[in-house]
Amino acid sequence: MIKNFMQELKTQRWDDHRYYHHSRINQSLHFVSAASFLFAYAMLFFDPVVSALVGWLVSMTSRQAGHFFFEPKGYDHVNHATHEHKEEIKVGYNLQRKVVLMTIWALSPLVLYVDPTLFGLFTPWADPADFMRQVAKIWLTIGLGGLLFRTIHLFFIRDVETGLVWMTKILTDPFSDLKLYYKAPLALMKGELIDPGLEKHVKHA
């Protein structure tokens, strides 16, 4: 059982890399995201508010910017797949689902501004610092909620193992991405916009 779980984790991680991380800019942003996520993980034990602010404002924005703005959207000649096919088979949040998640995140401060109690859940914020700390709590909830929602969703549309593997992958991605993409910034500075190693690795996979 453990062996199958680890193999499925390896497969999900490899598919995510080969389908959705061709751009060196995207890879570099994932490296930045991974480093800041690890800082956010550490801060979770000391100050969850700071953890949420770093996790969303630095880690998530840099990570998603890479996917939205820099990853090629045309035909994938390495994997022989259209962009539409890759979006359809995406285990986690594809671009359409990410738009929904990021929209909820971006609009949440506005909801708190309009209703300082957030439907009676909070004591009304008294100053900008208090406002940001309450926003951070909302963002932390959105992050955890997004993770659990897709995990449970996968239980029903795939199976329990796929959902648990995906959740494990997401939580451990910062460690994996640091190892996987630490060379990307240097390659980018040398003018390399697309990872040339993907085609070789896909052919031998």
Which residues make up each language-model segment?
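Alpha-helical transmembrane segments and their membrane-interface junctions
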Residues: 104-124, 191-203
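Hydrophobic alpha-helical transmembrane segments of multipass integral membrane proteins
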Residues: 31-42, 61, 141-144, 148-151
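Membrane-proximal soluble regions of multi-pass membrane proteins
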Residues: 1-17, 68-92, 151-205
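Membrane-helix exit/interface motif
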Residues: 40-43, 65-74, 110
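C-terminal halves and exits of single transmembrane alpha-helices
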Residues: 94-117, 178-186
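Hydrophobic alpha-helical membrane-embedded segments
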Residues: 46-71, 145-157
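Helix-coil boundary and interhelical linker segments in multi-pass alpha-helical membrane proteins
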Residues: 39-54, 110-137
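Membrane interfacial helix-start motif at the N-side
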Residues: 11-41, 86-101
